């Protein structure tokens, strides 16, 4: 066979022209140790802190420890089939999750993947889970309310849009119930919600999702799940993922509410990761940066000004402020709020709602202790009518607790003291509220007005609940226009006061409770 040199050169030229290769410079390393969800990798010289490392089987790990000879990374998912000698690659990017309106009404995992069986999610792109919080210049003061629907909270511990309000208490004191009711109450308020479940039983999360659906609030909510059975890395990252999903709405001039349930379990997951990475332990075996773990998360909840929104949307949205309100939950052990994580989160947040076991067991639900619960910035955001009327409620309850303790030792009480005690008892009874029954501003105003103006005087203690239910039914039926006016404006003036008084006088005359 005769080889023609011209043919060969033409063939080589043709092959060279057709040759198409995509060259991608990627750092490759080898796993040298695997244990408890932590891998140690040798050879990743160019890896960044927090960078995603690609593992076989479409899985990823996150580089957390950058050491001289190796990299300590935490695996996001199952790791049983990983072994020494397995090759891994850097990706050059940090963890991102899908964001957008398509997530509303869906249940997703830490990585934003759907786990509700409703098919793929139509997202508006991806955003990094770790973002620096807006600076001082980008922020605006809190001045609009977030109505939780709870009389005890909205009257005494008001929450504003862009605030961080901690819900703290022992297990089984109604912390999750309060947060879920706050989400249900946003059904028609236009506030988008994100519920982040960290380290909880799958059955508990399923129950929460079912309740949100029953009350028509799931369509307005993103549920992010990192259950107790999932890897510690996913539990540690879930709050950051949820925060990124909530920031999507804040940065576009809308209002969002995020619940972290709960940050104690996130801190435990982070402690586990840190100890496995052989980082030095500190108080209660938590690592030294556990404060930063929560502060960098909670600082992202804020109210941003019009300029920030306009700049972020490149002029598509103008004249609107955005907000992300956070309700972190912390579980205490035997009421010990001076433990490490509770004190950290109390110092980071703008106030706290203390729920107490004794109050819960005595039948006072929500079990809010108004003496040590506080809202540091919410007062400026409180609805005008509630602010005007509720001033005496906290005072009445504080005096009642003081006198109740004193009256145990005093045999005879003067009339003024007895009247104060009776008023305090009735106000305490009035603050009780059933789960999944949030109240509108007008309903709260009517009930507080009745307490403030002495309409509860002479009503038997066990009849206070019946009085309240009958009063609200009467006002909604007979004074619907007034109730609508209060709900729409939140205003309080002499005219509204006169109409409220006339309505209550008329109701008391009926004696229908």
UniProtKB/Swiss-Prot annotation:
Function: Produces ATP from ADP in the presence of a proton gradient across the membrane. The alpha chain is a regulatory subunit.
Lineage: Bacteria, Pseudomonadati, Pseudomonadota, Gammaproteobacteria, Alteromonadales
Subunit-level organization: F-type ATPases have 2 components, CF(1) - the catalytic core - and CF(0) - the membrane proton channel. CF(1) has five subunits: alpha(3), beta(3), gamma(1), delta(1), epsilon(1). CF(0) has three main subunits: a(1), b(2) and c(9-12). The alpha and beta chains form an alternating ring which encloses part of the gamma chain. CF(1) is attached to CF(0) by a central stalk formed by the gamma and epsilon chains, while a peripheral stalk is formed by the delta and b chains.
E.C. code: 7.1.2.2
Family the entry assigns: Belongs to the ATPase alpha/beta chains family.
InterPro entries attached to this UniProt entry: ATP_synth_asu-like_sf, ATP_synth_asu_C, ATP_synth_asu_C_sf, ATP_synth_F1_a_nt-bd_dom, ATP_synth_F1_asu, ATPase_a/bsu_AS, ATPase_F1/V1/A1_a/bsu_N, ATPase_F1/V1/A1_a/bsu_N_sf
Gene (UniProt): atpA
Location within or outside the cell: Cell inner membrane
Organism: Shewanella amazonensis (strain ATCC BAA-1098 / SB2B)
Descriptive protein name: ATP synthase subunit alpha
């Amino acid at each position: 066979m005769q080889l023609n040199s011209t043919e060969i050169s033409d063939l080589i030229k043709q092959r060279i022209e057709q040759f198409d290769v995509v060259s991608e410079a990627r750092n490759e390393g080898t796993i040298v140790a695997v244990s408890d969800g932590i891998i140690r990798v040798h050879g990743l010289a160019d890896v960044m802190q927090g960078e995603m490392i690609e593992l076989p089987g479409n899985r990823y790990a996150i580089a957390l420890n950058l050491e001289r000879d190796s990299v300590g990374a935490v695996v996001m998912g199952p790791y049983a089939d990983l072994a020494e000698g397995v090759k891994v690659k850097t990706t050059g990017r940090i963890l991102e999750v899908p964001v957008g309106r398509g997530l509303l009404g869906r249940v997703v995992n830490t990585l934003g993947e759907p786990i509700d069986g409703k098919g793929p999610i139509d997202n508006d792109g991806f955003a990094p889970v770790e973002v620096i919080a807006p600076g001082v210049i980008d922020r605006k003061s809190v001045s609009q309310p977030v109505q939780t629907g709870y009389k005890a909270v909205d009257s005494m511990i008001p929450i504003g849009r862009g605030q961080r309000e901690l819900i703290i208490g022992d297990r089984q004191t109604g912390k999750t119930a309060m947060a879920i009711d706050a989400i249900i109450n946003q059904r028609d308020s236009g506030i988008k919600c994100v519920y982040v479940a960290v380290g909880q039983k799958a059955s508990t999360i399923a129950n929460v999702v079912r309740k949100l659906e029953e009350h028509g609030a799931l369509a307005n909510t993103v549920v992010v799940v990192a259950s107790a059975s999932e890897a510690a890395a996913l539990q540690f990252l879930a709050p950051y993922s949820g925060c990124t999903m909530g920031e999507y709405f804040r940065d576009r001039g809308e209002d969002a509410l995020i619940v972290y349930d709960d940050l104690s379990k996130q801190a435990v997951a982070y402690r586990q990761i840190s100890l496995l990475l052989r980082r030095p332990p500190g108080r209660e075996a938590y690592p030294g940066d556990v404060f930063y773990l929560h502060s960098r998360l909670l600082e992202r909840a804020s109210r941003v000004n019009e300029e920030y929104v306009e700049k972020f949307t490149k002029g598509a949205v103008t004249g609107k402020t955005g907000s992300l309100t956070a309700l972190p939950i912390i579980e205490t052990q035997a009421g010990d709020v001076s433990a490490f994580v509770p004190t950290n989160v109390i110092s980071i947040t703008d106030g706290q709602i203390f729920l107490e076991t004794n109050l819960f067991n005595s039948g006072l639900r929500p079990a809010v202790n108004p003496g040590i619960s506080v809202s540091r910035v919410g007062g400026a955001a409180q609805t005008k009518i509630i602010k005007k009327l509720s001033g005496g409620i906290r005072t009445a309850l504080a005096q009642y607790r003081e006198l109740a303790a004193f009256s145990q030792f005093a045999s005879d009480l003067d009339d003024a003291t007895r009247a104060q005690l009776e008023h305090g008892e009735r106000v305490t009874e009035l603050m009780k509220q059933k789960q999944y029954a949030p109240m509108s501003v007008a309903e709260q105003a009517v009930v507080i007005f009745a307490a403030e103006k002495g309409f509860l005087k002479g009503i038997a203690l066990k009849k206070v609940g019946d009085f309240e239910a009958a009063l609200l039914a009467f006002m909604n039926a007979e004074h619907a226009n007034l109730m609508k006016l209060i709900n729409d404006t939140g205003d309080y003036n002499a005219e509204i006061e006169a109409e409220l008084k006339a309505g209550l006088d008329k109701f008391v005359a009926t004696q229908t409770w």
